[in-house]
Amino acid sequence: MNNFAQRWLFSTNHKDIGTLYLIFGAIAGVMGTCFSVLIRMELAQPGNQILGGNHQLYNVLITAHAFLMIFFMVMPAMIGGFGNWFVPILIGSPDMAFPRLNNISFWLLPPSLLLLLSSALVEVGCGSGWTVYPPLSGITSHSGGSVDLAIFSLHLSGVSSILGSINFITTIFNMRAPGLTMHRLPLFVWSVLVTAFLLLLSLPVLAGAITMLLTDRNFNTTFFDPAGGGDPILYQHLFWFFGHPEVYILILPGFGIISHIVSTFSRKPVFGYLGMVYAMISIGVLGFIVWAHHMFTVGLDVDTRAYFTAATMIIAVPTGIKIFSWIATMWGGSIQYKTPMLFAVGFIFLFTVGGLTGIVLANSGVDIALHDTYYVVAHFHYVLSMGAVFALFAGFYYWIGKITGLQYPETLGQIHFWITFFGVNLTFFPMHFLGLAGMPRRIPDYPDAYAGWNAFSSFGSYVSVVGIFCFFVVVFLTLTSENKCAPSPWAVEQNSTTLEWMVPSPPAFHTFEELPAIKESI
């Protein structure tokens, strides 16, 4: 027991902490998925279904689903899990710059998760949506401690992310192997670096906003209360100044993972490496100056709306550069459709669809009609549920052999992909039609006219759950398998381009006994 505590509770090893993050992300992901299925069961038919007319509970489910998936599934798994596991290995460093800071970055998350879950259990729960807009989140509409607990949960996970990003930035700037210049950094490392900067710059703004909300609720300040000279729109500006970079935080590490996978399975180096790097940096910078496109309906000036429309559309340019570079990487390649590559190609296709609906919503005039309808839900679920999540699965299949030293079952992995692909598309594609027909978000009941597409959508979510079940069967079979994984399972001969394939599978507790030196390539 003592050894167990020493290794897992007090761990300062980046691989062990990465493993903890991945397990934590899986647990939170299952909980978030359960909530989403409850939502789809309620919406399967018109009228009150499983929640018996408790509309507050429906909103609590919506809120908890969003928080779980964003802050406790995608971020811990992508940045904390794959980031911790592979950034030090990819840059040839013995560990992270601040190993004990790394430990507390992880251990702040379970208490944060407990606070979030308790917020759903006290009083009537926090039914404010993940945006926590006042006045709905104010003390008059949500008396009791539920919103306060959700705010504390956000504070805690925010501190965790800020500490983690400081650690990543320091590690990547200071601990690269000799000869590994910034212009030779693997793309996944670049993506984590940009993500860390986004976190560092955006989370303090969220912290300020929710702290003001906390004092509005408990100490009678009026930051967001017009009666005392405050303004609820100020909260929206602060929240979305964080919230928009946040969606890029969720997807950027995925971009890095996909770049590695597409390159590996096309047997070609990534097309336009520098372009890929600068595209990611541009996305990071532009992500900070488009926040008000979430607020086209609050009465912004027409010139303000014109600016945010234009700026939002500019983001499509670096994103397009990335998409076309992935396609160019595959062009003329000798492509192998193993499971990671299937998820990567699925990612590229579905992320493009999500980006396309994003361009539609960027038009402020169109958005007036589509704001807060299911069209928006369809848009960001194509980007997240099929972008971020597919990137996570792709990264899992790509690296699980390296993490465990065991080979995953290829056929079952492909079955997992096809069931999930079918399920998520069946869930979210009909939502475009519902949104165009005017069905509003976050409402637990709807007119009979919307019944058909909602039935399809709910069926799709049940299919997705079968896919998730397949995934956990894959995890179980991998961990209990006898098939050892080669140091470089994807290489035809020794043509690895990144360091993680040059160390054993699994890597030793201390990866590099001496610093690797990176020489000029021919």
UniProtKB/Swiss-Prot annotation:
It is a multi-pass membrane protein. Binds 2 heme A groups non-covalently per subunit. Binds a copper B center. Cu cation binds at H244, H293, H294. Belongs to the heme-copper respiratory oxidase family. Its cofactor is heme; Cu cation. This is Cytochrome c oxidase subunit 1. Component of the cytochrome c oxidase, the last enzyme in the mitochondrial electron transport chain which drives oxidative phosphorylation. The respiratory chain contains 3 multisubunit complexes succinate dehydrogenase (complex II, CII), ubiquinol-cytochrome c oxidoreductase (cytochrome b-c1 complex, complex III, CIII) and cytochrome c oxidase (complex IV, CIV), that cooperate to transfer electrons derived from NADH and succinate to molecular oxygen, creating an electrochemical gradient over the inner membrane that drives transmembrane transport and the ATP synthase. One of its GO terms (biological process) is electron transport coupled proton transport. It comes from Marchantia polymorpha. GO terms for cellular component: mitochondrial inner membrane; respiratory chain complex IV. Its EC number is 7.1.1.9. Heme a3 binds at H379. InterPro entries: Cyt_c_oxase-like_su1_dom (IPR023616), Cyt_c_oxase-like_su1_sf (IPR036927), Cyt_C_Oxase_1 (IPR000883), Cyt_c_Oxase_su1_BS (IPR023615), Cyt_c_oxase_su1_dom (IPR033944), Cyt_c_oxidase_su1_bac (IPR014241). Mg(2+) binds at H371, D372. It is found in: Mitochondrion inner membrane. It catalyses: 4 Fe(II)-[cytochrome c] + O2 + 8 H(+)(in) = 4 Fe(III)-[cytochrome c] + 2 H2O + 4 H(+)(out). Fe(II)-heme a binds at H65, H381. O2 binds at Y248.
